[in-house]
Every structure is written in structure tokens, then in C-alpha cells.
Regions:
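A feature for loop-to-transmembrane-helix boundaries and adjacent hydrophobic helices
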Residues: 1-346
Length: 346
């Protein structure tokens, strides 16, 4: 089934099919494809830049798997919790082929369970959070296009030239589930704000800005806090345009997600100001990442092999190539020391 989507002010129209392709009779939806593309981009970024954060790429595999799986489950749980009585069975609650993943649920679950996984695997938590925050921006920027193919998560009427119209937007705006501030009038026959596009652009711009800032970060967790501030500010504004949000205070149009976004922004600004002042004048030093092989070998010895000196850490502002070279040399040195210690023990 196709859906005609129009942008009258731009003279553009698209025939969209929610199904991207079929494998063995199973339909693969564009919604899932968009999420998968975003996830792949996030993974590529994480593995490419992990050493610059002092994170061993092999050690973070388990963290990523746990964070992704439980993050998706949390995203669905958050979405269902916002309107639990509209589902007739448990199967409807867990079905995500038609959409229904709440980003904030995924963010909360990803950070929470990912943090626990970091403790389990011996991965530094805050540096991993910084990598994750960058990945979230890529994933969210791509994932929002799944809403476009599903024709969901759009806003109220607009006269702007990029206003969007389709039979899906019209049908939804004629339903009883529309949520808008008290006094706001909705015309189902007029174009609406493509809020999925706003959020996608906001996330990609945020990724670009934070990517430029990586080498200038002042402390571990700096990128994470700036992500919370940036995404929260954008989400607060964009959420106010949408017509499918759970209202917290209908009289003033305050949504639940706006409250969460507002808390994230305020808390993020407060924490950023505090830690920036605390670490003022102190350049961030990143410990070189010990690989999984050396970590496992150290556990067999009486104590860890460590080396004091400048060759065990680098300034966060150091180029990626230097991190690669120094990390490789450091792990070779540790491996040799472990082998020597093992021979003495034998």
C-alpha cells in the first residue's frame, strides 16, 4: 500500500510504500531500515573513534550489544507506558513494525543498562557515554526518517512552504487522538509541520557541532552533557508542535516529553557549568586503552602490569593517528611485560 505525500508549497510529491522489501514473504519496513542505518552509522563512529576516548573497541562490543537491545526494549516500554490502555494484548504491546519507539525511553535505557555493562566489562563509563551520545545523534537523525515513511510524528498546521500533507495526516487529524494545546484549531485538510524533519536536522547539526568539539572537551562526560542540553532544547521546541504527544498540562500545552527535555536541559547546564569550573585550566588526559587480550592475561597474574609516565596517556586534543600509534605500542609493551612476568612466575 502506497501513500501520496505532498509538499504543496515546494511543488513536491512522493508515493511512499512503508515496506522497503520482502524476504521470504516477510515484509521489511522502512521504519526498521532507517533505525538500522542509524545504528550502523553510530557503530562505525564508535569503533573508529573509541581509542580517542580511551575505550578498547573489543571490550565495548558487549556493552554495545546490551545497550542496544535493552535500549530498544526500554524505548518500547516507555512508549507503551504513556498509553497502556490502548493495547488489547501483550502482542500489540511488543509489536514495533508499525512504529512506536520513544526516543527518551531508548536514551534512558541505553545509558542505564550500558553503564551497568561498562562496569561488568571494565570499560570506562563516562568516556563510553560520550561515544554513545555521539552515536545517539546519528541514530536519531536517521531514525526519524522512519516516521516519514510511516507518516507519523508530525505537527500541527503550518503555512510554511515545507508544510506536508497526506491522507495519513488528514485521517489522523480527523481522529479523536489528536493532542494540541487548549484553543488551538486543527484543519485536517491543510499541510502540517514535518517535525520528523526538524528533529532529524537538529540531530545532524548537533552531531557536527559536537564532532568539532571532541578535541576540545574539558572532562569525561562533557560530550554527554552537551548532548543532553542540545537534544533537550530541540526536543522541547519540536514537541510543542506535535499533535500526538501525551499532554501533562493541557491548558498550557505542556507535554510529558517537554518536561523530560526541560529537566535534561536544566540539569545539563548546571552540571556543565559546575564541571567546567572544576576542571578549568586542567587539560583532559586520556589513558591509553588496554586491549581485551592484555586484560585477560593480567587476571592470571598476581597483580596488574602498569607503567608510569607520559606514554600511558595522551591529551584529548591529540590527533587520532597518534592515539592509534601510542595505543598499539603501549599494548605491545604490556604484552611483553606480562610474558616476562609469567616466565618468572613459572
Amino acid at each position: 500500500m502506497t501513500n501520496l505525500v505532498q509538499f504543496p508549497g515546494l511543488g513536491l510529491s512522493f508515493h511512499l510504500n512503508r515496506v522497503a522489501f520482502t524476504i521470504g514473504g516477510v515484509s521489511i519496513y522502512w521504519y526498521g531500515v532507517c533505525i538500522a542505518v542509524g545504528l550502523c552509522l553510530a557503530l562505525v563512529f564508535a569503533f573508529r573513534h573509541s581509542l580517542e576516548f580511551g575505550v578498547d573497541p573489543d571490550s565495548m562490543v558487549d556493552v554495545i550489544l546490551i545497550g542496544v537491545v535493552l535500549g530498544i526494549i526500554s524505548a518500547r516500554a516507555y512508549y507503551v507506558a504513556m498509553a497502556p490502555f490502548k493495547y488489547e494484548s501483550i502482542w500489540e504491546m511488543i509489536a514495533i513494525r508499525d512504529g512506536g519507539l520513544a526516543i527518551y525511553g531508548g536514551v534512558i535505557g541505553g545509558f542505564l543498562f550500558g553503564g551497568l555493562a561498562c562496569k561488568w566489562r571494565g570499560v570506562p563509563v563516562l568516556p563510553m557515554f560520550d561515544l554513545t551520545a555521539m552515536g545517539f545523534l546519528l541514530g536519531q537523525g536517521c531514525g526519524r526518517w522512519g516516521n516519514f515513511f510511516n507518516q507519523e510524528a508530525f505537527g500541527c498546521n503550518t503555512t510554511l512552504p515545507w508544510g506536508m500533507y497526506s491522507e495519513a495526516t488528514r485521517a489522523y487529524l480527523m481522529s479523536s487522538t489528536v493532542t494540541v494545546p487548549k484553543g488551538v484549531v486543527i484543519d485536517p485538510n491543510l499541510p502540517v509541520h514535518p517535525t520528523f524533519l526538524y528533529e532529524s536536522i537538529w540531530c545532524f547539526v548537533g552531531f557536527f557541532l559536537l564532532f568539532r568539539y571532541i578535541k576540545k572537551r574539558k572532562f569525561n562526560g562533557d560530550i554527554t552533557l552537551r548532548y543532553l542540553i542540545w537534544y533537550g532544547a530541540g526536543r522541547f521546541w519540536i514537541e510543542g508542535l506535535r499533535t500526538d504527544s501525551l499532554m501533562l498540562v493541557p491548558s498550557i500545552g505542556l507535554r510529558v516529553s517537554q518536561l523530560v527535555a526541560g529537566i535534561a536541559v536544566v540539569a545539563g547546564i548546571a552540571a556543565e557549568a559546575y564541571f567546567t569550573r572544576k576542571f578549568k585550566g586542567k587539560p583532559l588526559l586520556v589513558p591509553l586503552a588496554l586491549n581485551a587480550e592484555n586484560k585477560a592475561a593480567q587476571k592470571k597474574l598476581d597483580g596488574p602490569i602498569s607503567f608510569a609516565g607520559k606514554d600511558t596517556q595522551l591529551l584529548a586534543s591529540s590527533p587520532r593517528k597518534l592515539f592509534l600509534e601510542k595505543t598499539e605500542a603501549y599494548n605491545a609493551q604490556v604484552k611483553a611485560a606480562i610474558e616476562q612476568a609469567g616466565q618468572k612466575k613459572a
